[in-house]
A protein has these predicted regions:
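Class I S-adenosyl-L-methionine-dependent methyltransferase catalytic core
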Residues: 2-199
Length: 199
C-alpha cells in the first residue's frame, strides 16, 4: 500500500524494498548509478551565480567545468586536509553530510549545498546553531552526471548554507537564482543572549 501511494505521488518512481532509496527519473539520492558513486555535479549556473570560489574539497576527479580555483578529490580526502579561502562544498549526500557541514562551520568561510532536510541531525547540529544565512532554492535542481550530461530532477529541495560574512554576502546579493534568503540567528547566540538578559 505504502509503495503504491509513493509511486502514485512520484510518478516515475522505482522502489526496491522499504528502506531503499527512491529513484525519480534519472536522479537517485544516494548515488549516480551510471558511475556507482555518490557523485553528482553542481549545476554550472549555481557556481556562476555564487562564485568564484577558492576551493572545492568535494570535487569529482573528472569534471566538465571548474567549481573553484583549487579542487580536492576523493583521492585527497578533502574532509581531512586544511581548507583556505572561500570554500564551495557540495558534499556527498549520505551519512557523512554532517561531518562536511561541521567542517564548513569550523572553517567559517564556506557556501554549502545540501538537501533542505531541516529535520536531520546534520541540520540541527551544524546548520541552525552555526550558519550565518540560508538560501532555499525555488523548485528542485537538476544535477549532472560526471560526463556533464544533465540528470533528472533532484529527489528533494536544496538549500545553500552560508558560513561567514563573504558567503552570506554572496547569498544576499544573488539576483539570478530564484528562492528565499533567510538570515540565520544561530541558536547558540540566542542562548547566549538569553543568559545575558537573565544576569
Amino acid at each position: 500500500m505504502k509503495k503504491q501511494i509513493i509511486q502514485k505521488i512520484a510518478g516515475d518512481t522505482d522502489i526496491v524494498g522499504s528502506h531503499a532509496p527512491i529513484k525519480l527519473g534519472n536522479f537517485r539520492h544516494d548515488r549516480n548509478l551510471e558511475h556507482g558513486k555518490e557523485e553528482w555535479l553542481t549545476p554550472p549556473e549555481i557556481i556562476t551565480a555564487f562564485g568564484p570560489f577558492d576551493l572545492d574539497p568535494c570535487a569529482p576527479v573528472k569534471r566538465p567545468w571548474e567549481t573553484a580555483t583549487t579542487h580536492y578529490t576523493i583521492a585527497d580526502d578533502g574532509l581531512m586536509v586544511p581548507w583556505e579561502g572561500l570554500v564551495w562544498c557540495n558534499p556527498p549526500y549520505g551519512p557523512k553530510t554532517g561531518d562536511w557541514l561541521a567542517k564548513c562551520a569550523t572553517h567559517g568561510n564556506c557556501l554549502a549545498l545540501v538537501f533542505a532536510r531541516t529535520d536531520t541531525q546534520a541540520f540541527q547540529n551544524h546548520v541552525w546553531p552555526r550558519a550565518t544565512s540560508l538560501f532555499f532554492i525555488a523548485g528542485r535542481l537538476s544535477f549532472s552526471h560526471v560526463s556533464g550530461e544533465k540528470g533528472g530532477t533532484a529527489g528533494a529541495p536544496n538549500v545553500l548554507i552560508a558560513y561567514g560574512d563573504l558567503a552570506n554576502q554572496r547569498l544576499r546579493d544573488n539576483k539570478s537564482i530564484a528562492g528565499q534568503y533567510l538570515q540565520n540567528v544561530p541558536s547558540n547566540l540566542i542562548r547566549l543572549r538569553q543568559e545575558n538578559s537573565n544576569n
